[in-house]
């Protein structure tokens, strides 16, 4: 425990919170260009082929971004919007691609949770 005199000389330091998504630079989303679109396998105990793209952002950062939903239309040079949010079973993937924005299409035949996948309301 510090004495009053010590605290007068040198006040307590507040801990600095480290950002989980440094490439966004405090923005909600960032635009970027796909440099590589590929699939990768998750950590144990999961098994799948997860769709991921490498994105060069407008601020110069290059990050890996997860492509959620069933099927996608992304290829090299596609312009995408990314948001924060990591994928727990893919090491190094700390961003998500926003579906239905810029060159990314929404998920086809999606009925529930449509807003998360950029799908329009189906004609009843």
Swiss-Prot record:
GO cellular component: small ribosomal subunit
Keyword annotations of the record: Methylation, Ribonucleoprotein, Ribosomal protein, RNA-binding, rRNA-binding, tRNA-binding
Gene3D superfamilies for this protein: Nucleic acid-binding proteins
GO MF annotations, alphabetized: rRNA binding; structural constituent of ribosome; tRNA binding
Key word rRNA-binding present: yes
3-methylthioaspartic acid sites (modified residues): 89
GO BP terms, alphabetized: translation
Keyword Ribonucleoprotein found: yes
Family: Belongs to the universal ribosomal protein uS12 family.
Chain residue ranges for the region called Disordered: 1-23, 101-124
InterPro entries from the UniProt entry: NA-bd_OB-fold, Ribosomal_uS12, Ribosomal_uS12_bac
Protein name: Small ribosomal subunit protein uS12
Assembly notes: Part of the 30S ribosomal subunit. Contacts proteins S8 and S17. May interact with IF1 in the 30S initiation complex.
Gene for this chain: rpsL
Role summary: With S4 and S5 plays an important role in translational accuracy.
SUPFAM superfamilies attached to this UniProt entry: Nucleic acid-binding proteins
Compositional bias segments (type: Basic residues): 111-124
HAMAP family: Ribosomal_uS12_B
Entries under Pfam families matching the protein: Ribosom_S12_S23
């Amino acid at each position: 425990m510090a004495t009053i005199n010590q605290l007068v000389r040198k006040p307590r330091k507040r801990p600095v919170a480290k950002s989980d998504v440094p490439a966004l630079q405090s923005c909600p989303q960032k635009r970027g260009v796909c440099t590589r679109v590929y699939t990768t396998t998750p950590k144990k105990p999961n098994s799948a082929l997860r769709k991921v793209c490498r994105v060069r952002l407008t601020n110069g950062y290059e990050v890996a971004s997860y492509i959620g939903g069933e099927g996608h239309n992304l290829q090299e040079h596609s312009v995408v919007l990314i948001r924060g949010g990591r994928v727990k079973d893919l090491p190094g993937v700390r961003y998500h691609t926003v579906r239905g924005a810029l060159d990314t299409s929404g998920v086809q035949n999606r009925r529930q949770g449509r807003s998360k996948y950029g799908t329009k309301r189906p004609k009843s």
